[in-house]
């Protein structure tokens, strides 16, 4: 396999293409014998790689032919020309049975053929890995177009990469095992050579050992080849670094270098062997590489000088296969997920370099970046969310900082060949972190890689991938600040992968001593670019390096956390990162790159980043500012390296810490001061980057791994300052920063002058910085960084309120104080607890503050609320800073409110930018009433105050259903509501308005929010109540608005019509409709807002009823309560139907007065009052019950009938569960009542008016004891009473008072019976109306449906009526029998009991059979519905559904009314009979 010719595809590898074009030949191979064929395919167009054979199993059919070699590119299978897609090839291969005919394209130059890790293993490949690494770099097919100049490196990268990619796919399953990774093919697609691939790039060249691919896979973290990191894998940082090291070591001035000089691409390939690889894969690779352990291995290799020696691509790989250990290292790190973070940084560096070298492939790089991002994300998730999230974030930050610190501090960098593990790791981590931040942005990683490469280049001379292609400025590509380049490249790569990579690619790559490189290579553009990038990075880094020193201490953790944060915090950091990068590019490109980048950062792909980019990146005037800002970022990064040094070496750590601290202090000042200082800082950090202390690398690989693991574990413990919750005082403390002025005064404030680029970056990174404060750029990183580990992200979803706290802690904390590593080290659990406590206090305080400062907040926030406005007037970064400050900048009030509601202000760091950008989009904040969690939407639409003062509650990623929170959160946080009722209301209003604003996000957001806040809570409250109801309803009614209004109506368990409309106007409108139709039911529903029964009771007392949003008259409510008592179920339907009227055809207009009369205390209006309410106890009911108790106490004969405590089974009891409850029916029917409104009979109204006691009667009717007594039981009781001796009745016990009470009870029951009868009449009208609707539906169905379908419809309707009546009949009979059994004498005759038991058994069986019929009927209903759905319009279908559901409900309701009336009549009879003896006396 080693001898196999390179698989690099000429057309893919620019460098390979030229020489390979002639050297390429087609080989026809025919295999026979059937599967398995014994070869492995990798790459494919879907991965942006050539379809290459990466491995040939020994002793396999493929090996027996001797014509097939690893690295061969498959052109045709079974005479079918391939389009280049791997799946296509796999299908064709699988479709081959006995014979398989392959046509492969082979390069005649064996030096290009990657060695097979599979065949050679680590040890076998070691000698060739150097070559293969180199080859990988140049053999990356995808590099061809992108890096033609660097043909050798690219060719190697391409061919090797393809192999490794194939291996990657082969070994994705091996990601879980380090060993397997070692033996498995790289995860990265051909284009995505992982750093592992990189590490074993030599091996890769030899054949992309499984180990490489395994590492690649692992680093990809479950990113499958489908995610294919394009050439990034081939040009993974590790591979690149290794190759470069080997190449440079062997020939620092070798032809490759000279080639680099003469041939920018070629030279780039050499000096940035890694770069060439990256270009093809840089987009993808950077992230995968970041994830890939090979990167770790790379820096592991960096420890080995020989490894770094990479002979010319054409030369045989002389360096020992050190890549293996590196890969193992990287893999183990990746396996641990912590070290993996490290490795990725290194790979990222390489990939960054690749990106830089990849200028031509920029578009492609972007695509790859996307893929890479996905892989990266997957990697973080799969290979180690902790690592990916924490490790990468921390490492990423450290990486950048390290680069910066190395460059700035001028810290001696180990021999490039001996890239410090920390350096590589940081680079990779940083890259990863940034990458994570900008997962969607693929480019970010690439820059990291290039920078790493630069640092890694052996001989102390970093090969800085030139970026001429991108910027057409080789100097820029090679900016001495390798770190800058990495940061810049990464920044760009993330956002402008192509641009950064392209310059690197385009520009000649020259191995320059690190010190020289930093200085000589640096040009104004370089500085500016690096600075800009550093600014962005810094912004990003600041997030990472909020506490440089602490980061240094916890550097590794931070890196891990940073990496993790990158993954999890990608949302915000990526945005910052991207924005920063955009800004970075903008300086050199006048932000044109930003535009290009914005393309990458498309609204669809990366909406948040897109908005952020637009917000800050689009300001061309700040390119310098960005540059200036960036150095501070680097300074922040310098601070980070401190943590990293912790990981790597105390000396390095201390040195870096000191340098970074100084640099950051000066640079933060400089950033604020101006571009020149920033540039100086940039130069410093570049120098720091250039100098990579060798001491930074552990003496041994194991040590590195252990250290990395430990760091990563700590980092994954979420022991990050970013995540550590800050006391509420931090919020308050940051309040200064929260203020715009303060924010601006902070690093952001300095940017106002540099509003465009610098502010942007500041905003992304510095925006966070503002929260930390001017002097605390690192802190800013913490706050702004808000990178959440995978776990944290998960928690953000599982415990949204805490996720807010998590974010908040970082955001707020940053300004007030710089976190120490210890803070960061704090366990996530501790941090979480702290967050909870803090958030609670903060929420409470914030709520109060909001109440006090709601309006001011609006004003303060309005500037931000109008994001477009803010964008134009104030740098988006300011807004974002505010957001980053979690609204701290906005104002303490807002922050408080945000804290109060979301406690996300700290979290906002990551999503603050998103929110800011979202706000800019003017998406109205959906005031998630102090909900326990909010999504990005919530953050954006936190509320009026929140929106205005972007209390960026990074509740959750926008992906999370923030809108689903609704006011649900209100019930969830009753305490909060209680504490901050005002705020809560405000929040509710905000939410409601936010919803309303959603329709008009641009203009309304601010105004509506302000208006609502201004409205303050009185009016909003009503609206909120309605809106909240709507929201709550959407929220499954679980979250009811605190106000009783919103309490679910028992009738429907749903909020009133308000549910569907945000405006109370709608409610009023509905109410009007109801008035025309049956306002009472609707009103009842609304009144029912109160806790079910309580609200019902309150219905009895209109004063108790909460004001209806629709302004329902309490009298009407009272009437409703009375009426509802009469007719509950249908009323519910009617109510909903009434609600529907506005939607559906409105009921015939009836004089509102007619329904209004319902105020008449009886259910004069269509007794469309729900029985549920009727069943509710009213004052009259209570009085009746009291009378009944008194009477029963004195006249035991009436106990069974009158005693409310006596439980008698009724027909409805047995029907329970068979048919949906009223609320369910209403929900299903969707309040679509097409029935004509029924006007209460004038007679009924008159009667009610005539009888002042009617209301009481109605109430009585609802809860009268006889309601709970079935007619059958009443008869039974009467019989039993008749059996009793008259003495009991006529005993002289009964006094006149008892007779009076009985008479009162009789009167009460009589009134109730009158109400029930009226309700029955109304019900009959409803039944008629429903039948009329059914007739209409039937006519329509008959016209549109086929005869057989129409027959099914008619049969179903007919059976529905029959089954319902059958169930009712059986239930009634069974209830009577059971009541009789329960009321048997103590010594009943055996015959009687036995007879009753037998009847009970038979009836029970019949009842069960009827239930089965009902189930069958339900199935038929679904069938009929499906049939009708194909014919009927939506409206007609809704009518049908309403008709069917109402039909059964009305039948049941009718039966229930009949039973109640019968029972009442029997009760009256019993009472009259009991009075007879007394009267006779």
Curated annotation (Swiss-Prot):
Keywords: Actin-binding, Cell junction, Cell membrane, Cytoplasm, Cytoskeleton, Developmental protein, Membrane, Microtubule, Phosphoprotein, Tight junction. The keyword Transmembrane helix does not apply. Coiled coil: none annotated. Residues 705-807 form the ASD1 domain. Present in kidney tubules and in the vasculature of many tissues (at protein level). The modification Phosphoserine is found at residues 236, 318, 330, 935, 959-960, 962, 1041, 1043, 1165. It is found in: Apical cell membrane; Cell junction, Tight junction; Cytoplasm, Cytoskeleton. Residues 26-108 form the PDZ domain. Transmembrane segments: none annotated. Residues 1-20, 189-234, 250-299, 430-501, 612-643, 717-760, 944-983, 997-1051, 1086-1112, 1139-1182 are annotated as: Disordered. The keyword Cell membrane applies. Residues 1149-1158 have a biased composition (Pro residues). Interacts with F-actin. Belongs to the shroom family. May be involved in endothelial cell morphology changes during cell spreading. In the retinal pigment epithelium, may regulate the biogenesis of melanosomes and promote their association with the apical cell surface by inducing gamma-tubulin redistribution. The ASD1 domain mediates F-actin binding. This is Protein Shroom2. The gene is Shroom2.
